[in-house]
């Protein structure tokens, strides 16, 4: 199945503890239906020192967010939108913003 959310997309969180925050998709986990978004769902992890060069301590790590809790930001209107697909005349399948009907990529 084609991905509606891809790496590099600007998204907004529409549900959950981070509701309203915007960020860029760093990684998509299709097997889990989740995505890692910059600045969203940040958790603190306690790590041990590994070897001589690496330091232990508390690090902040972005955790995955379920795809149903994020919405793509329409590049034209700068508002959250759903994503559809359309096949162009030259045969390419592209993503389309449902609100503005504009092509997102391609």
From Swiss-Prot:
SUPFAM superfamilies (alphabetical): Translation proteins SH3-like domain
GO cellular component: ribonucleoprotein complex; ribosome
Coiled-coil segments: none
Keywords recorded for this protein, A-Z: Ribonucleoprotein, Ribosomal protein, RNA-binding, rRNA-binding
GO biological process, any: translation
Matching Gene3D superfamilies: 2.30.30.30
NCBIfam families found in the cross-reference section: rplX_bact (TIGR01079)
Family: Belongs to the universal ribosomal protein uL24 family.
Name of this protein: Large ribosomal subunit protein uL24
């Amino acid at each position: 199945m084609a991905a509606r959310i891809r790496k590099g997309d600007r998204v907004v969180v529409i549900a959950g503890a981070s509701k309203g925050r915007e960020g860029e998709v760093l990684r998509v986990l299709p097997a889990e239906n989740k995505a890692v978004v910059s600045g969203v769902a940040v958790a603190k992890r306690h790590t041990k020192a590994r070897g001589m060069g690496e330091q232990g301590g508390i690090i902040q790590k972005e955790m995955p967010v379920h795809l149903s809790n994020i919405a793509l930001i329409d590049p034209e209107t700068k508002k959250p939108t759903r994503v559809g697909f359309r096949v162009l005349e030259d045969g390419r399948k592209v993503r389309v913003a449902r609100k503005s009907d504009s092509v997102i990529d391609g």
